[in-house]
A protein has these predicted regions:
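Conserved N-terminal beta1-alpha1 strand-loop-helix module at the mouth
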Residues: 1-86, 91-99, 103-113, 122-131, ...
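Residue-level recognition of the GNAT/N-acetyltransferase active site
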Residues: 116
């Protein structure tokens, strides 16, 4: 297993976003957190910011959708420059999550699912055949700068 570094653009100074993207030029990916205020209590960035970042970097962009009904938006995020899109298994019905993963792959992008810290690991099983990645959250989704939850480490192995 290799380690990949994907700094979150959510931590950037948005007045200096271009400089923030350039500062992570040696990373493996750019992690792009999307929050809708419904699935998580916070609202973050969206498609126009992704389009701007795509113009500033050749790095793969990993879009983490913390939104309800992700299948409604995956095409737009893929078209805006995402290389990898992940959806939370808790964000919709299994059928709709399957649909989101299918749409992502139909756009020629990598797809994956995400688990909140307290979601049972088995929740990913119905989706594994369509996943290029499984992201296990080590903090509660929705806010940057949180403390790491040590008990999540055992779920990753």
């Amino acid at each position: 297993m290799s380690v990949k570094i994907a700094p979150s653009i959510l931590s950037a100074d948005f007045a200096e976003l271009g400089a923030g993207v350039e500062a992570i030029a040696t990373a493996d990916y750019v992690h792009f957190d999307v929050m809708d205020g419904c699935f998580v209590p916070n609202i973050s960035i969206g498609i126009p910011v992704l389009q701007s970042i795509r113009k500033r970097t050749a790095l793969p962009i990993d879009v983490h959708l913390m939104i309800v009904q992700p299948e409604r938006y995956v095409d737009q995020f893929c078209d805006a420059g995402a290389d990898l899109v992940t959806c939370h298994v808790e964000a919709d019905t299994p059928e709709k999550i399957h649909l989101a993963l299918d749409k992502i792959h139909a756009k020629g992008k990598k797809a994956g699912v995400v688990l909140k810290p307290n979601t049972r690991a088995e929740a990913v099983l119905p989706f594994l055949d369509k996943c290029d990645i499984v992201l296990v959250m080590t903090v509660e989704p929705g806010f940057g700068g949180q403390k790491f939850i040590p008990t999540t480490v055992s779920r990753v192995a």
